[in-house]
Amino acid sequence: MSEIITLSYGSICNNTVTHLYNTQESLISYTPSSKPNHDLQVFLTRFKSTSVSYSPRALIYDLRNGLGALNKYEYHETLPVDLNFSLLSTNTTAPAGAETGAGSSLESGYNLKKSRVEKNEYQQKLDQGVTDGSSLNVNNTKYWTDYNKLIYNPKSLTTVNNFVHNENNHESGYHYNFNSLKYDSFNIGQEEFKACNNGNGGYGYDDNDNNKSIENFRYFLEKTDRLQGLQLLTNLNDAWGGFTSEMLIDLIDEFFNNTSSDKQNLWIYGIMNSTKLSEKTQSIRTKLSFIKTLIELTKQSSLIFPMNLNNSKDESWHNNYSMLTDKYNSGSNWHQSSLYATFINSIWGLNNQLKNQISMTHLQNDIVKLNPNQKIINQIKIKQEKSGNGDKQNQLFGSDLNQFNLKDIVNLKDLSNLGKSSDTSATQREINLGISKNASTNTGNDAYHNFVQNRISSSTSQNEKMMKDKEQEQNGIINNYLNPYIDNIFQVETFPVDILKSSSNAINISTEFNVNDGLKSYLKPYIKLVSNIRNQHREYLDIIEDKEELLEDLNNISQEYSYGYESDDEDYE
């Protein structure tokens, strides 16, 4: 047995792991005669009891009030002796717009009590042993605990005290005593981790345990027989990135200091909470915080998968080539996180399927075999596979032919192909999760140069077709992986399956995650932005710390993703 410990930080990431662990729960066999297809103990810990009972092998971090209706000791008989029961029984917060400051009623941060969040209908039925996801919607899934199925060990759940969860999921959390101070930048996350862990200037964690991060990780580490690696999910565009970076420094120093970097499996799924703001309309402060987070986490990890659901400016969520239906709500963390989870679940399936199991070490070696410094997976896609010999026009334009209009014809590169089956990616439904979007938009070229291409699909026939297509391109290393259960996440009753288009009442997908030269084009405006920061920009320098070091890191990574001759190389000097 080879275990994986998962660490997740913040609301959008915790929603994502909830989808993932609900999928793991669906794999549990409750009858002795059932034959398992997965090694559940890769991601789950089995309880010592007469019944089959599992708990996530995970550390979950959230802001104050971020657990919603869940009391982390609710399903456990005993409470810790030193628990501050006032924090357990009530959620306290200073709401946005409330008066704060010295002498105010909110000075301590504990004087104003918020009414307890009630369990939704799904959780009430789940407590009665009934699993019915039909009641779930965007209005009653404000918290990841609203549709969580597994019972967490109390040591898994940690909330910080200094910042409060914002019920508007697209806005950053705020300081409990100074609501104008947002939990939105790398340096604030760094400061919060230090405050929580040394007690200076803060109240620490929810139970005032200033050593909690190290000791709780140690608890789960000691429960493993043979650690396969760590998989972290964190937000790249708020303060959780800085919090994660500081925690990694401590964890690596305490537990992995004697492990060489090439033998350490430390993956980060960097998630960007999709907002109404495009990358072009984000503030300088937001952009600097993001790029600082990306660079620091890249240096600390062995692989990083940055993901961003904001499509490039010329793409539409609901065009005929998208997998998304008009029921998709970008303002819902339940919806948004399900797409990130769909991709990650394809990898989790490789990690714990009993047949053709692919370990973290195996997959990591395949990806970095050409260049160990190419650790950023910059292109990530979920693709919908065509099923059988179905209607060719349905395959081309979607299941609803009534949606076909003149705009669809204009989008076609070749009108002679109208109504014909096509194997090109332009006519295949997909969701682009990566930070490198459309090649022609970002670079002016028709395609990126791929250094390494990776694909996970459910059948060998799909892999053979992909291999044939990619061989014609003669473009980098190609890795194909088989996961027959890649679609199992759609069978879980808590997954919002109606946001995805289906073909013949089935959703057949494959996933791709590639390393290509698109990252160099992506980093170019950030290099220019950092270069223009001056010494008088104190607010910006607080985020990026050492400007010259950040520029050097950016240029070094950019060069690792260069291919061929580029006339504008001087832009990177």
Curated annotation (Swiss-Prot):
It is found in: Mitochondrion. Involved in the partitioning of the mitochondrial organelle and mitochondrial DNA (mtDNA) inheritance. Belongs to the misato family. GO terms for biological process: mitochondrion organization. Keywords: Mitochondrion. SUPFAM superfamilies: Tubulin nucleotide-binding domain-like. It comes from Candida albicans (strain SC5314 / ATCC MYA-2876). Its main location: mitochondrion. Pfam families: Misat_Tub_SegII (PF10644), Tubulin_3 (PF14881). This is Protein DML1. GO terms for cellular component: cytoplasm; mitochondrion.
